[in-house]
């Protein structure tokens, strides 16, 4: 699928909603939609046939599926089931390709007829769905000159970048790189209590992951002397004053538009106090801009522009005792650094008036153009830096790169391809519309990127693994392609032997005398199966070299007992639970990670940290360390059969 259609599986949800009033199904949509449909809607054999479906069918598997469907479609009486099957075919690249292949369609004429009828019936809905999908795509046009643009990305070095920051970073990078522009990465280091040099290194690493490597680096602290001078200038203009009103009282007064008792303070007295603040001797005072306490825009009600803070700064040490607020420093440094385009989240929109008040009243020559955009919100995702910091600092998670966190480093360890992330974020454009995004859409693009370049391996769950004896083979090794459709990935050495392991789940499915397929090997026939207390303990099988894998229902992954390697497979979930409490400790989801141990084929020892692979019939995994793998979200596959 291309960038505009990778979410087409949502078509099934759209049809079910419009025609049958059904609520949206979670991905995989087709599978969950089928589960929710009443079983009496399915003629005999159809459920098993649909079980062989996968979004990533090979050509031979696609033909097999359509041929199998051909023998059953005329018995389907339910329009809802027909529509689900229509959606399954319509959103599957391989199946739609086969439906247009004149040589192949002769093998499944009834399937083609059913599909054609449903296509005609659903044509109006298809048009609506596709039109809606186009509207959802953002654009990157803001009506500003595209040449010599200078943008800035100003992160605070008090944590790592999360996916929300990624949008701001990439939009600033995009507009700067369009035509001879420049991007400035400026660390907003105005709060020495929270900021550390290690976070600067981490943020630069995050930007590198996003592919942002060309920029000019600066710090707000580079301009502290100039910013302080401008604070003094504002006092001299009668447009700033020192204030020792208690914080809670000040908050209440600003909310009600009540002027501070300090607002009429003499200019020289404010200068004297500000000088003492700069020495760290005026505890309890701040400096406020004198703007308009009656303004309907609360951002204009005499905002604080300097605070005393005696904590040592990670760059300037104890040189300064007074620090500017972000709202005061930002327009100053934007102007001084020659920024032409200031891209900001629209949550700051009420501060735009304040931003330009500072530019104008400080008589700064360069006046950047502000363009704001909506934040990206994601379902069940914590983007509050305060909450993330709490869980990191208190040991609930392993660090800022924990896979449960939506930080750039965290989702990298979940197997996110950064090119896919860039593509998705830029596809949202500079929209003003705030919306909540489902992660499955992002991971759908990710799968499109990783699937063609991920090597394939087998693994079997250790718990109650079934020992299988093969009575007509010997031990040997053979080189097998790591990916049948991508020879560039090379080969792996597979060890074949008379003693292999199957998962308990697969062992239970196989019946006595059943012919099944051992993937990457051939067909085999079950000779005997030993079951103790409901658990399959061992099996005996014979290889059938003349068997046709196209005729077997069950295709099983396996590993040789000798040479198998134990791997840790981790599945990460949501960071927080649904408890109705403000206590972050109680909100932590203590079931947010599940770890299991599996036997993997011996070639797995060659997989290096950072690689993404597929354990076939299981899911895609990110190698998080030697023999440690993290499941990529929305890639877990059905185990039994197929």
UniProtKB/Swiss-Prot annotation:
One of its GO terms (cellular component) is methionyl glutamyl tRNA synthetase complex. It is an enzyme of class 6 (ligase). InterPro entries: aa-tRNA-synth_I_CS, Gln/Glu-tRNA_Ligase, Glu-tRNA-synth_arc/euk, Glu/Gln-tRNA-synth, Glu/Gln-tRNA-synth_Ib_cat-dom, Glu/Gln-tRNA-synth_Ib_codon-bd, Glu_tRNA_lig_a-bdl, Rbsml_bL25/Gln-tRNA_synth_N. Its main location: cytoplasm. A motif ('HIGH' region) lies at residues 157-166. Keywords: Aminoacyl-tRNA synthetase, ATP-binding, Cytoplasm, Ligase, Nucleotide-binding, Protein biosynthesis. GO terms for molecular function: ATP binding; glutamate-tRNA ligase activity. It catalyses: tRNA(Glu) + L-glutamate + ATP = L-glutamyl-tRNA(Glu) + AMP + diphosphate. PROSITE patterns: AA_TRNA_LIGASE_I. It comes from the Eukaryota. Disulfide bonds: none annotated. ATP binds at residues 162, 347, 382-386. Its EC number is 6.1.1.17. Pfam families: tRNA-synt_1c (PF00749), tRNA-synt_1c_C (PF03950), tRNA-synt_1c_C2 (PF20974). GO terms for biological process: glutamyl-tRNA aminoacylation. A motif ('KMSKS' region) lies at residues 382-386. L-glutamate binds at residues 152-154, 188, 326-330, 344. SUPFAM superfamilies: Nucleotidylyl transferase, Ribosomal protein L25-like. HAMAP family: Glu_tRNA_synth_type2 (MF_02076). PANTHER family: GLUTAMATE--TRNA LIGASE, GLUTAMINE-TRNA LIGASE. This is Probable glutamate--tRNA ligase, cytoplasmic. It comes from Encephalitozoon cuniculi (strain GB-M1) (Microsporidian parasite).
């Amino acid at each position: 699928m291309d960038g505009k259609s990778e979410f087409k599986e949502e078509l099934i949800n759209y049809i079910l909603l419009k025609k049958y009033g059904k609520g949206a199904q979670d991905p995989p949509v087709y599978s969950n939609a089928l589960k929710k449909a009443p079983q009496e809607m399915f003629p005999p054999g159809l459920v098993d046939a649909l079980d062989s479906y996968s979004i990533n069918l090979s050509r031979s598997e696609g033909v097999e599926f359509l041929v199998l469907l051909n023998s059953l479609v005329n018995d389907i009486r339910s329009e809802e089931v027909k529509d689900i099957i229509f959606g399954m075919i319509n959103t599957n690249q391989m199946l739609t390709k086969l439906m247009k292949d004149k040589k192949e369609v002769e093998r499944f004429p009834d399937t083609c007829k059913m599909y054609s009828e449903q296509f005609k019936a659903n044509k109006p809905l298809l048009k609506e769905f596709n039109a809606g999908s186009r509207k959802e795509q953002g654009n990157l046009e803001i009506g500003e000159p595209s040449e010599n643009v200078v943008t800035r990305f100003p992160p605070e070095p008090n944590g790592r970048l999360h996916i929300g920051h990624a949008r701001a970073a990439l939009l600033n990078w995009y507009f700067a790189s369009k035509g001879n522009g420049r991007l400035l990465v400026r660390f907003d280091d105005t709060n020495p209590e929270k900021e550390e040099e290690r976070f600067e290194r981490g943020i630069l690493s995050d930007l590198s992951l996003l592919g942002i490597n060309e920029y000019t680096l600066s710090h707000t602290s580079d301009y502290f002397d100039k910013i302080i001078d401008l604070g003094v200038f504002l006092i001299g203009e009668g447009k700033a004053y020192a204030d020792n009103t208690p914080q809670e009282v000040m908050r209440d007064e600003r909310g009600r538009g009540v002027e501070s008792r300090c607002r009429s303070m003499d200019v020289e007295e404010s200068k004297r106090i500000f000088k003492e603040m700069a020495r760290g001797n005026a505890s309890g005072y701040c400096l406020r801009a004198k703007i308009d306490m009656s303004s309907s825009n609360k951002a204009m009600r005499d905002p604080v522009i300097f605070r005393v803070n005696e904590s040592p700064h990670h760059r300037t040490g104890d040189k300064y005792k007074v620090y500017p607020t972000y709202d005061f420093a930002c327009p100053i440094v934007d102007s001084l650094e020659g920024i032409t385009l200031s891209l900001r989240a629209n949550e700051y929109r009420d501060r735009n008036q304040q931003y330009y008040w500072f530019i104008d009243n400080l008589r700064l020559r360069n006046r950047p153009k502000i363009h704001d955009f909506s934040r990206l919100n994601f379902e069940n995702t914590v983007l509050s830096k305060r909450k993330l910091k709490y869980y990191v600092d208190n040991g609930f998670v392993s660090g800022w790169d924990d896979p449960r966190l939506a930080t750039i480093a965290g989702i990298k360890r979940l197997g996110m391809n950064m090119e896919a992330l860039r593509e998705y974020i830029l596809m949202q454009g500079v929209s003003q519309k705030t919306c909540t995004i489902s992660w499955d859409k992002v991971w759908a693009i990710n799968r499109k990127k990783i699937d063609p370049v991920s090597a394939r391996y087998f693994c079997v769950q250790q718990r109650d693994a079934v020992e299988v004896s093969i009575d007509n083979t010997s031990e040997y090794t053979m080189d097998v392609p790591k990916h049948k459709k991508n020879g560039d990935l090379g080969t792996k050495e597979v060890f074949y032997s008379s003693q292999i392991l199957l998962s308990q789940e697969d062992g239970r499915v196989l019946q006595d005398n059943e012919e099944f397929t051992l993937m990457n090997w051939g067909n085999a026939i079950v000779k005997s199966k030993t079951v103790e207390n409901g658990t399959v303990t061992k099996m005996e099988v014979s290889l059938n070299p003349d068997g046709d894998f196209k005729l077997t229902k069950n295709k099983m992954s396996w590993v040789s007992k000798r040479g198998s390697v134990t791997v840790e497979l981790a599945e990460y979930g949501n960071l927080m639970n649904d408890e109705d409490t403000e206590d972050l400790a109680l909100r932590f989801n203590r079931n947010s990670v599940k770890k299991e141990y599996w036997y993997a084929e011996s070639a797995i020892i060659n997989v290096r940290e950072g690689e993404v692979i597929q354990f076939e019939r299981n899911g895609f995994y990110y190698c998080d360390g030697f023999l440690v793998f993290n499941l990529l979200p929305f890639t877990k596959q059905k185990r039994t059969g197929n």
